[in-house]
Design a protein with these regions (language model features):
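Minor-groove-contacting beta-hairpin "wing" of winged helix-turn-helix DNA-binding domains
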Residues: 61-68
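Non-DNA-binding regulatory cores of transcription-related proteins
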Residues: 68-136
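N-terminal helix-turn-helix DNA-binding core of bacterial DNA-binding proteins
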Residues: 5, 9-37
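Basic amphipathic alpha-helical segments that dock to polyanions
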Residues: 42, 46-50
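Conserved acidic, metal-coordinating active-site core of Asp-based
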Residues: 58
Length: 136
Protein backbone atom coordinates (compact mmCIF):
# COMPACT_ATOMS: atom_id res chain seq x y z
CA UNK A 1 0.00 0.00 0.00
CA UNK A 2 1.30 3.41 -0.92
CA UNK A 3 -0.12 6.85 -0.16
CA UNK A 4 -0.41 9.16 -3.17
CA UNK A 5 1.65 12.35 -3.43
CA UNK A 6 -1.66 14.17 -3.15
CA UNK A 7 -1.96 12.91 0.44
CA UNK A 8 1.48 14.32 1.23
CA UNK A 9 0.30 17.68 -0.12
CA UNK A 10 -2.84 17.46 2.04
CA UNK A 11 -0.65 16.87 5.10
CA UNK A 12 1.49 19.87 4.14
CA UNK A 13 -1.50 22.16 3.58
CA UNK A 14 -3.17 21.19 6.86
CA UNK A 15 0.09 21.62 8.78
CA UNK A 16 0.68 25.00 7.14
CA UNK A 17 -2.83 26.16 8.06
CA UNK A 18 -2.34 24.83 11.59
CA UNK A 19 0.93 26.69 12.10
CA UNK A 20 0.19 29.90 10.19
CA UNK A 21 -3.57 30.27 9.95
CA UNK A 22 -4.79 30.41 13.51
CA UNK A 23 -5.41 34.17 13.44
CA UNK A 24 -5.63 34.94 9.74
CA UNK A 25 -6.97 33.82 6.40
CA UNK A 26 -4.27 32.42 4.11
CA UNK A 27 -4.32 32.81 0.33
CA UNK A 28 -3.99 29.85 -2.00
CA UNK A 29 -0.95 31.55 -3.55
CA UNK A 30 0.81 31.62 -0.18
CA UNK A 31 -0.04 27.99 0.53
CA UNK A 32 1.15 26.90 -2.93
CA UNK A 33 4.37 28.86 -2.69
CA UNK A 34 5.31 27.87 0.86
CA UNK A 35 4.36 24.21 0.43
CA UNK A 36 5.82 24.02 -3.10
CA UNK A 37 2.61 22.69 -4.63
CA UNK A 38 1.52 23.65 -8.15
CA UNK A 39 -1.15 26.32 -7.68
CA UNK A 40 -3.96 24.65 -9.66
CA UNK A 41 -3.30 21.37 -7.86
CA UNK A 42 -3.45 23.10 -4.47
CA UNK A 43 -6.79 24.67 -5.43
CA UNK A 44 -8.20 21.22 -6.26
CA UNK A 45 -6.94 19.85 -2.94
CA UNK A 46 -8.34 22.82 -1.00
CA UNK A 47 -11.73 22.26 -2.64
CA UNK A 48 -11.65 18.61 -1.49
CA UNK A 49 -10.68 19.74 2.02
CA UNK A 50 -13.66 22.10 2.02
CA UNK A 51 -15.97 19.31 0.88
CA UNK A 52 -14.64 17.17 3.75
CA UNK A 53 -15.45 20.02 6.21
CA UNK A 54 -11.79 20.53 7.10
CA UNK A 55 -11.31 24.05 5.69
CA UNK A 56 -13.44 27.13 5.08
CA UNK A 57 -13.10 29.10 1.85
CA UNK A 58 -13.37 32.89 2.09
CA UNK A 59 -14.13 34.42 -1.30
CA UNK A 60 -13.18 37.85 -2.61
CA UNK A 61 -10.09 40.01 -2.98
CA UNK A 62 -8.95 39.28 0.57
CA UNK A 63 -10.19 35.72 0.48
CA UNK A 64 -8.35 32.56 1.30
CA UNK A 65 -8.49 29.54 3.55
CA UNK A 66 -8.70 28.71 7.21
CA UNK A 67 -9.23 25.48 9.16
CA UNK A 68 -12.91 24.87 9.82
CA UNK A 69 -12.28 23.38 13.25
CA UNK A 70 -9.49 23.32 15.78
CA UNK A 71 -6.40 21.53 14.48
CA UNK A 72 -6.49 19.23 17.52
CA UNK A 73 -9.72 17.81 16.08
CA UNK A 74 -8.29 17.10 12.61
CA UNK A 75 -6.53 13.75 12.37
CA UNK A 76 -4.37 12.00 9.81
CA UNK A 77 -7.39 9.78 9.14
CA UNK A 78 -9.50 12.84 8.29
CA UNK A 79 -6.79 14.10 5.95
CA UNK A 80 -6.43 10.80 4.09
CA UNK A 81 -10.17 10.26 3.83
CA UNK A 82 -10.65 13.77 2.39
CA UNK A 83 -8.87 12.48 -0.72
CA UNK A 84 -9.26 8.69 -0.69
CA UNK A 85 -12.64 8.18 0.96
CA UNK A 86 -12.96 5.46 3.60
CA UNK A 87 -9.72 3.67 4.38
CA UNK A 88 -9.82 0.02 3.35
CA UNK A 89 -6.77 -2.22 2.96
CA UNK A 90 -8.60 -4.81 0.83
CA UNK A 91 -12.08 -4.77 -0.70
CA UNK A 92 -13.04 -8.09 0.87
CA UNK A 93 -12.75 -6.51 4.32
CA UNK A 94 -15.76 -4.34 3.46
CA UNK A 95 -17.54 -6.87 1.22
CA UNK A 96 -16.73 -10.46 2.27
CA UNK A 97 -18.51 -11.81 -0.83
CA UNK A 98 -15.73 -10.27 -2.95
CA UNK A 99 -13.07 -12.35 -1.16
CA UNK A 100 -11.17 -14.44 -3.71
CA UNK A 101 -9.74 -16.82 -1.11
CA UNK A 102 -12.61 -18.24 0.92
CA UNK A 103 -15.38 -15.69 0.63
CA UNK A 104 -14.21 -13.76 3.68
CA UNK A 105 -13.94 -16.78 5.96
CA UNK A 106 -10.17 -17.20 6.11
CA UNK A 107 -7.25 -16.41 8.38
CA UNK A 108 -5.84 -13.86 5.93
CA UNK A 109 -9.13 -11.95 6.01
CA UNK A 110 -9.24 -11.90 9.81
CA UNK A 111 -5.60 -10.80 10.16
CA UNK A 112 -5.97 -8.05 7.56
CA UNK A 113 -9.13 -6.79 9.29
CA UNK A 114 -7.21 -6.56 12.56
CA UNK A 115 -4.30 -4.76 10.87
CA UNK A 116 -6.72 -2.35 9.18
CA UNK A 117 -8.42 -1.60 12.52
CA UNK A 118 -5.07 -0.88 14.20
CA UNK A 119 -3.94 1.29 11.27
CA UNK A 120 -7.14 3.36 11.32
CA UNK A 121 -6.99 3.66 15.10
CA UNK A 122 -3.43 4.99 14.94
CA UNK A 123 -4.36 7.49 12.22
CA UNK A 124 -7.20 8.72 14.45
CA UNK A 125 -4.78 9.21 17.35
CA UNK A 126 -2.55 11.68 15.48
CA UNK A 127 -3.87 15.22 15.10
CA UNK A 128 -2.40 18.23 13.34
CA UNK A 129 -1.95 20.33 16.48
CA UNK A 130 0.28 17.64 17.98
CA UNK A 131 2.18 17.33 14.69
CA UNK A 132 2.69 21.11 14.54
CA UNK A 133 3.85 21.12 18.16
CA UNK A 134 6.48 18.48 17.38
CA UNK A 135 5.00 15.75 19.59
CA UNK A 136 5.98 13.10 17.04
Amino acid sequence: MRLKNEIEYVFGILLYLTINGENRIISSNEISEKEEIPHLFSLRILKKLEKADLVIIFKGAKGGYKLKKDSSEITLKDAIESIEGDICIKDCLESPESCTLRKGNCGVHRVLKDIESQFISRLQDVNFRDLADGKY
